[in-house]
Amino acid sequence: MSTYPPETLDPDYDDGTMPSNVDTLAEAVVGQRIVTVEKDVRIHDRYYGTRNATVITLDNGKRVSLVNTDDCCAYTELEAFLLHPERVDHIITGVGTTDGFTRWHIYADMGDVLELTVGWSSGNPFYYGYGFNITVEEVSA
């Protein structure tokens, strides 16, 4: 089973936003299977009308959307993802990170199911917002 020890960053560099983002994603995906992953999907946004997101569709009929953020010099951006189709039949058991929250791992008993490459900066700590906007919604029929 893959596990990743929790990362800890200097409090001058991150105010807990990144670990909170990982926890939010884990709450949405653990115990489920990934059906699809799509990048640059237009989704409804309560503030901006629509925005692009990376959308993970799960076997429980829910869609988890990760929306990039940018606020002046602070940002969080999904740069790339790698889905391991040979492992999508396995139930997700956790979400971990490596390399200072720049590599995110959604994993199951047989290893990573989905790997995310994430660029991020807290900018001028902590005046500007950063971290993914993560939403979970039911897939409409």
Label each PLM-derived region with a short phrase.
Residues S2-A141:
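Surface-exposed, interaction-prone regions used to assemble/regulate multi-protein complexes
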